Structures are given as C-alpha cells and as structure tokens.
Regions:
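Bacterial Sec-dependent N-terminal signal peptides
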Residues: 1-22
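Acidic Gly/Asp/Thr-rich repetitive segments characteristic of extracellular carbohydrate-active
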Residues: 23, 27-59, 497, 583
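Extracellular beta-strand solenoids
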Residues: 26, 58, 69-70, 83, ...
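Extracellular beta-strand-rich solenoid/capping regions of secreted or surface-exposed proteins
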Residues: 50-53, 64-82, 90-145, 159-173, ...
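Predominantly extracellular beta-rich ligand-binding scaffolds that present long acidic/polar faces
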Residues: 53, 66-72, 76, 103, ...
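Surface-exposed loop/turn segments connecting beta-strands in extracellular beta-rich domains
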Residues: 65-66, 84, 89, 93, ...
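Surface beta-loop-beta hairpin patches that serve as ligand-binding interfaces in beta-rich domains
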Residues: 497-543
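C-terminal outer-membrane/trafficking sorting elements
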Residues: 545-621
Length: 621
C-alpha cells in the first residue's frame, strides 16, 4: 500500500509576489520538517510552503494523493516541478497496486489561475475513483497554463464519476507540450487528453510527442458526443491547435456499447466556430475505432470558419470496425452551406487505411469520407500518395472475386458541392469515389473522373493494379521504417519510381507557401521539385546518417554547466536535433561550446577535426 496519504491545499491567484523564487527538493527519504534543501529534502511536495516562482525538484518516486487544489485565493502564480534524477516520478499508487485495480481519491493537480511547468519527470498510475471534475491527473481551468517538457505520462485513468474526460489532462486553458509521451491512459472522452472550450478559446501545442496505447472506455460526461477520441477529445467553437513531429500509435476508441468514434482524435466543432487545427511531420499508425473513424472523427459546424491542415504526414493501417472511414470522417445529414475555410492535404503518404487489412474484409470502406459541403470551403489536395486499397483479389464468400476494397478518398457531392477554391494536382491515388451530380459543376470528383482535367493537373490513378505492381510503380516501401531516433516513416526506395520529383515545387495559398522544403525527417528538398508524399529520396540529411562515426576526438558534457568539451581543438562543430534540424550556430576552432539553453533530449554533434575528417557523436542532455 502507499506509505503516504496527505492533504494539501494550495491557493493560487494573480496577486502580488510575496517572496523571491526559491528551489526546494523532495525525496522519499526526506522529511517535511526539513528545510527542503538538497541535503535535507522534504518528504512530500509540501505545497503549503511553496513560494511564487519556486522550483520543486523531485529526486525519486513520491506519492501524491489527494489533489493539490489550486484555488483562487492564494499568492502563488507560477510553480515549476521537475525531476532531479531518471527515477523521478509522481504517482498515485505503485505499479503492482495499479495493476491490482487500486484506485485514488482524486486527481494530482487542479489548476485555477496559475501557471504550472512540469519538466523531466514521470506522472503515473492514477485511477480516479469517482468525482465530478474533469481530468484524470490534471485539470486546467480557462485562466491557467500548463507546460510539459520531457515528461512521461502513463496510466492516467478516469472511467467512474461524472465528466470522465482526459485520462491524463483536461485543459480548458493554455496547454504547451514538448518531448512528452502519453501511454496507457483511458477516459470516456479523450483517452489521454481532453481540450474543451468553456470561457476562453482552446490553445494547445504538441511537439515531439508520442500518443501510444491510449483508449476510450465506459463512463459519462454532462455533455458532448459520447465515448470518443482514443488519444484526444477536442470540443469547442474557437481553437488554435497544432501538432508537429508527433506519433499516434495504436490508440483505440472502444466501449461496451461499441459506438465509440475516433481511434486517435474526436474533433467536435460547435456552431459559429472559428477553428484552426494543424498536423505537420506526424505519423499516425494502427489506430482503431469500433464505432467510426480509425483516426479522426470530425463533427463539422453548420456555421463558422474551419481550417484543417495536414502537411508532411504518414498515415498507415488505421481502421474502423464501423460503417465510416478508416482515417478521417466528416459526415453531416445536410450540406454545411454556412461553413467556410479550408481542408489542406499536402505531401502526405497514406497507405493501407482500410478494413481490408490484417484479416478484416469489407468492400465499402474508404480512407477519407466527406459528405456534402456546400459553403465557401476550399479543398487543397497536392503532392500526396494514397495507396489505401492495398488488397489482392479475394473471394467474398459467394464466389465473387473482389480485387479492390473501398477508395482512398470518398466525397459526396450529390446535394451540394463546395463553392470554394479547388487546388487538386500532382497526386497519386488508387481510387476516388462518392456521389456526384454534374449539374453542380466541376467539384472534387471531377478533377479525377474527367480524364483531361486529371492529366492536365498530373493526378494519376493506379487503381486496378496489384499491390506489388503499385509498390513497384511508385517506388515505395510496404512497411514503416523505424529509425533509431525520430518518428517512423514510409520510405521511397527507388530513384526511378513515379514518386521521385513528381511533386509541385511551390504553392502559395493565402499568402503562405504550402509545399514543405523538408520531409518528415527534416531532410531538405533535392532538385527542383518535392517528391510525392512525406519522404524525400536521397536528400541532404543533417543527421547521424550523413556522418562517419570513427571518432578520434572525445566529447564530454558537463551537465551542471551545460558546456560541451572536446579532447582537442576542432575545426568546426555543429549540433542537430534527432530530427536533423540545426539547433546552435556553427562554431569554428573551438575546444568547447555552450549548450546550456538547449532543451533536454538526444542531439547529434557533427565534428570536423583539424585534418578535415568528419564524424559524429550522440549526446544526451
């Protein structure tokens, strides 16, 4: 059992600062009677003794139960909690207790009008027992801000009580997350994270994050759309949300009623919305729903402005057991004539996103499925590879052979079509489908079904070919490549394949260049044109793959000072993130460089010695 249960009430509000910033230490071997120094640490987080702007350093695993209540009446406006060792963790119960089903009284943190920073630490093993509030581990009110950097969030569960939203986090305020893993979390709405608008617009940023094995479950919520969003549930009118270099892996929307939607994300847009949601350089793989939409279920608003953007992403083997699309679904019973905005889909690679994989056979499934738009809504579809009907001929059971299952993209243009701009060019796809009424004019389907228009815009179909024929013609791998660092991707493997240099090199849309100049790994564009999809073949990569590794110069990092030392003077040194992006200015003729301001993570040091030899070292900061 837990060896500590304590009650802490922390009142935080926007009042004057009463004390200078301090640093306090916490250890399971300490005592709350101690002054909280490194030599004499506290035993608990000891919130009654915090000061505004203080930093709490957790040295090992500590328990937290019940919640640190952030009420409106206190003097503290900002607190930072960070790990001081690799073992540092805040937990509700230990691993054995969690696996045995032991539950907790409440959440970890309840933020009201405060800024909380969590760094270099693990939050784990909280199964909330009842309660009326949202957020399994953390609730963020509309006037608060939560920042996570290099955090592991594991086993946050909320499936009992009222408002079972966000197994890890429910945010109604500002949320900024970097280098963070959400794993094994579960809730009725938003297995890992719930983003809701109440009094202020939603603002959220996710960079270098992993959402893995999160799921929906049974439960209740006072309002909303039911069980949805294996990784995230998003609901509101106004929102600004962006995902960059994130990996959505094996998240599931499931519940007893089997109507859960959005294996990865449920995007619920309320009326008169103003929404901007962006995905760049992300990989979405093996997500599943039992209701509808393997990755994203998008509930459109009938009035408002919506801009969804997908650039440089990989979508692989996402699927649903329900009646709608395996990747993205947006269905309405009537055309959304009052909704304006855009759906931008550029340089993405989409493969095997249908139920005709892994032993599941259906003949009417699609990767993307949209119903009638009707309003001033733009559809931008450029430089994509969509090979989602990747099934050899099979017998349906009645002797009928089916050689293609579903479509890559299906859109209904029967009752109306979008009156916005269509930019549809340089795509390779194994089929588009849907309902089309020619009296509405040249819509999305017209750009593919009219042979002259398709040829003029370089939109090529490979429907009717076998799987091996498609892969060979495109010159692309069948499976994900999993690098040592960074997110998985699908690799172009043939310099003579159709994908090479067949993309648009530049596209200015509403004053913005849409064509990415680097691929999903950070590899720069080679030649005058981007390759199709999210991968650039044979590009110049600023990563360990470019470098020789027989190092004669030794590298030493002083973790206290943030100074990187070399055993001898080097001609030049450059540093890159694990995604191949430069992170400090190049230094010449040096014996050390200062990397104190770099965030914690894995970096590649590229060194040129005095003899001109080039090699690399990996370091962990």
């Amino acid at each position: 059992m837990k060896n500590l249960f304590y009650s802490m009430v922390l009142a935080l509000c926007w009042q004057s600062n009463l004390s200078a910033q301090e640093t306090f230490y916490v250890s399971s071997s300490g005592s709350d009677d101690n002054p909280g120094t490194k030599e004499q640490p506290w035993y608990s987080l000891n919130a009654d003794n915090w000061t505004d702007g203080c930093t709490i350093i957790v040295l090992d695993e500590i328990y937290l139960d019940p919640v640190i209540d952030v009420s409106k009446e206190a003097t503290i406006k900002e607190v930072t909690i960070k790990g001081g060792s690799p073992e540092a963790a805040i937990m509700g119960v230990n691993d054995d207790e969690f696996n045995d089903g032991e539950m907790n009284v409440s959440s970890f943190f309840d933020l009201k009008r405060v800024k909380l920073n969590l760094e270099d630490i693990t939050l784990k093993n909280l199964h909330r027992d009842g309660g009326t509030g949202s957020g399994g581990m953390i609730y963020v009110d509309p006037y608060s801000e939560l920042n996570l950097n290099n955090v592991v969030v594991r086993n946050g569960v909320v499936t009992t009580g009222v408002n079972c939203r966000g197994g890890a986090i429910c945010s109604e305020g500002k949320l900024v997350v970097k280098n963070t893993i959400f794993e094994g979390c579960k809730a009725y709405q938003g297995g890992a994270v719930c983003l809701r608008e109440s009094e202020n617009p939603i603002y959220a940023r996710f960079e270098d994050c992993i959402f893995r094995n999160n799921e929906t479950g049974d439960g209740v919520a006072e309002d909303g759309s039911g069980a949805a969003g294996g990784a995230l549930y998003i609901e509101g009118m106004e929102m600004d949300i962006a995902f960059d270099k994130c990996y959505f892996d094996s998240n599931v929307a499931t519940n007893t009623a089997r109507n859960a939607t959005g294996g990865g994300i449920r995007l619920f847009l309320n009326e008169e919305c103003n929404a901007n949601v962006t995905f760049m350089n992300c990989t979405v793989a093996n997500n599943k729903s039992v209701g509808a939409s393997g990755f994203m279920h998008w509930a459109r608003c009938e009035q408002g402005n919506v801009n969804l953007k997908f650039v440089n992403n990989v979508f692989y083997k996402n699927r649903t057991e329900g009646p709608q699309a395996n990747l993205i679904t947006s269905q309405k019973s009537a055309p959304t004539v009052g909704m304006s905005g855009s759906f931008v889909f550029v340089n993405n690679t989409s493969m095997m996103n249908n139920t005709g994989v892994d032993g599941l056979v259906q003949t009417d499934q699609n990767a993307i499925n949209f119903s009638d738009f009707g309003g001033d809504f733009d559809l931008v579809f450029v430089n994509n590879i969509m090979l989602d009907c990747m099934i050899e001929p099979i017998d349906k059971g009645d002797g009928t052979m089916v050689d293609q299952l579903g479509w890559g993209w299906s859109i209904r243009e029967k009752d109306a079509r979008s009156k916005g701009e269509y930019i549809i060019k340089n795509n390779l796809i194994d089929g588009v489908g849907g309902a089309y009424d020619a009296t509405w004019g040249a819509g999305f389907l017209y750009h593919f079904n009219n042979e002259d228009i398709a040829t003029a815009n370089n939109n090529k179909s490979v429907r009717g070919k076998s799987t091996d024929q498609k892969l060979k013609q495109v010159g692309i791998n069948r499976k994900l490549t999993e690098p040592t660092e960074g997110i998985p991707y699908i690799e172009i493997n043939d310099p003579e394949g159709y994908a090479i240099d067949n993309g648009v090199s530049s596209l200015i849309y509403k004053g913005e260049e849409l064509i990415p100049q680097t691929d999903i790994r950070g590899v720069a564009k080679t030649g005058n044109s981007r390759d199709l999809g999210a991968f650039e073949y044979n590009g110049v990569v600023s990563s360990v793959n470019e470098f020789k590794v027989d190092s004669q110069v030794h590298v030493y990092l002083n973790h206290l000072t943030g100074i990187l030392y070399f055993s001898e003077e080097v001609a030049s040194v450059q540093m890159y993130t694990s995604f191949g992006m430069p992170c400090i200015p190049s230094a010449v003729n040096v014996t050390s460089v200062n990397i104190q301001n770099l965030e914690k993570g894995i970096y590649i040091v590229r060194i040129v010695d005095k003899n001109g030899k080039v090699y690399s070292e990996k370091i962990l900061k």
